[in-house]
Amino acid sequence: MKKVFLLIATTILNSSILILDSHAGGMMTNTNQNAAFIRNPARDGAIGIDGVYSNPAGVALMPEGWHMSLNWQLAWQRRIVDTQNPVFMRDANNGGSDSKHYRGIATAPFLPSVQLAYNWKKFSFQASGAVSGGGGKCTFDSGLGSFDAAIGRVWAGMLSPVANNLNNLFSAYGLHAKAPVSTGYSSNGFMEGKQYYFGGTIGAAYKIVDKENIKVSGYAGVRFLYGMAGYKAEITDIKVHTTDGAQPLATYINNISNSIYQAGVEAAMTGKTEALQAVTKAGEDLSQQSGQLAKYYNGVYLQSDQNGFGVCPIIGLDVKYQWVNFAFKYEFRTKMNMTNSSTVKEAGLFSAVNQFVDGTSVREDTPALLTLGLELEPLKGLRFDVGYHHFYDRQAKKTYFDANGNRHDDKNQMLSKGTDEWLAGVEYDFGKDKRWTVSGGIQTTNYGNTDEYMSDLSFVTNSWSFGTGVKYKINDKMAVNVGYFQTNYRDYNQAADYRDAAGSNNKFTRRNRVFAAGLDIDF
């Protein structure tokens, strides 16, 4: 029975990334850090002020002077989980069905970013700030399937059989007491998570070769990450349904206890010594089990805030030959230890709560990232872009707790591979003095998801995205970018939930939309 309750704690407390990741990118990384990306995601080989993030070495090829980009993004997302589990048939609120539909709503109304560069002779000094991971809050008003299944397992593992076992015991000894038989259960769930990774970079690029037909520049810099997160989970109004109606959990346990008391009195008064011993033993067992249950009489409420800090180096290279530009960037893995400030003050009740025990820390590394980009401009004002991203997800440490409460820092080893992204885009300058630029691009993202890794508490699925928008040069010193980006996620069918009963399965999908506007200034 202890493992059943351990599953409740594990279910709730392993929900450490139930958030809006409003990004295009890998498991923990936002790559949409400029409005120029929103209108054309294949910016890895492009030269522009947005390159402070996407192609920092190429920024050195911009004209001398100051360059700045101010950006704002609005993102909204839905997470959808369809869960099938045999235990749901006993949920009194589910109409006898073994399936449930869960929908999480997430919004990030204000995602700012800024890129700044000062080019002087062969040098380019750069800095940026953005929400480089996470970016909002996600709320499941009806909880999640893993929540409901945890309560269902408690019912199936203890609440359902206890009355039947007692009634069989009473009948075997000719006692007339009756324990209330349970026919099902019900509860209400709620889950909310928010997470922000604020990233800042400083670095410098240098023109190694600066000739008319070929230019080569290199970059070295550092990224600083500050992570902050908050998680809230509730399971309320837990009730046991019987032939006499629904009863609060405490009331039901009390009625079970009363039936044992009545049986004991009858056994004592009729001189049934063996029956009295058996009933007394049943009472002792119930007392132990009800002691475990007592902390859930008023439901479950857990809240935790986390924060952490990490640093990683970045290197880059840009090679421009006539109308062809190639760029490379590598961001090293960022080690992140997230420290808890939590309502969970001790780990003695369940070892699984170690993930959120106040004052302790867990690993939430940001994986290393390799980007390659190529831009071709065969005609003046017409540019074709392609790019490739690889996130080294499996090498990034991430803490999780198994069903027995044991800590592991290698959850990402459950992935089959790192994340791969392919990008392509096109831009065309037109109008008087080429003041207008229209652009569009696509991106495909493929994760190394496995059934073992996936969970309704933390999931992302393979996707394809498109972005489109325009740029308008107000004058020679200022330009406005406006774009729309949409991600279309594929369904992921999890044949068997590793943390659930046989015969259960999940179908995961998401919907994501982003609108962005930005202002580029040269001075």
Which sequence ranges carry the predicted segments?
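Transmembrane beta-barrel strands of outer-membrane/channel proteins
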Residues: 68-76, 127-131, 220-226, 328-332, ...
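Extracellular loop and loop/strand-boundary signature of outer-membrane beta-barrel proteins
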Residues: 97-102, 185-191, 298-303, 355-361, ...
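Repeated loop/turn-to-beta-strand initiation elements of outer-membrane beta-barrel proteins
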Residues: 66-67, 122-125, 211-218, 323-326, ...
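Residues that define the transmembrane beta-barrel architecture of outer-membrane proteins
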Residues: 50, 107-112, 194-200, 307-313, ...
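Outer-membrane beta-barrel "beta-signal"
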Residues: 509-523
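N-terminal, post-signal peptide beta-strand-biased segments of exported outer-membrane/organellar beta-barrel
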Residues: 20-140, 146-153, 459, 485
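Residues on the lipid-exposed face of transmembrane beta-strands in outer-membrane beta-barrel proteins
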Residues: 58, 109-118, 127, 200-206, ...
